[in-house]
Amino acid sequence: MTDLVPLLQEFYRDKLTMMRRHAAAARVVAQYDANNTYQYIINREETQLSWIAKAIEELGGTVADGADGGRSLSGKGDGASRAAIEEDARDAQSFVDRWRPRVDAMTHARHAKMLRVILGEALEAKRFFEQALAGRTDLLGRRADVLEPASGEVLPTRWIE
């Protein structure tokens, strides 16, 4: 168990960094369906981080929230959006490639399964990114035939009076 807490803490930091990078990307990805997909992915990542944090705390460890996304996105429009999505697709695969061997070597079945679920969801996010790059708008499901195709853009920040 002595190796388990540091491993979970490192995984947590990597996942937190990934979530913060996705939040930064969501500010430049304006296409409605792609942005909704980012919101869905970020929500899942918040849930995953809560699972990992709970596991760390149950083992007597502490959770550090100091990870920085380290992402500065410049530009606007489709070019900036495409660059962010392409980078996130690559990062998702890199995350899985980096962590899968370590997770597969874990002997603690419950925590290994939890991390495998998270790795699977990272691959699902990668698939969403690839579909967005291909121009798909049915990322989170299909609309009824009676409705028009989605259109519109999302503002980079919330407008509150």
Feature-to-residue mapping (PLM):
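Iron-associated oxidoreductase/ferritin-like identity signal
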Residues: M1-E161
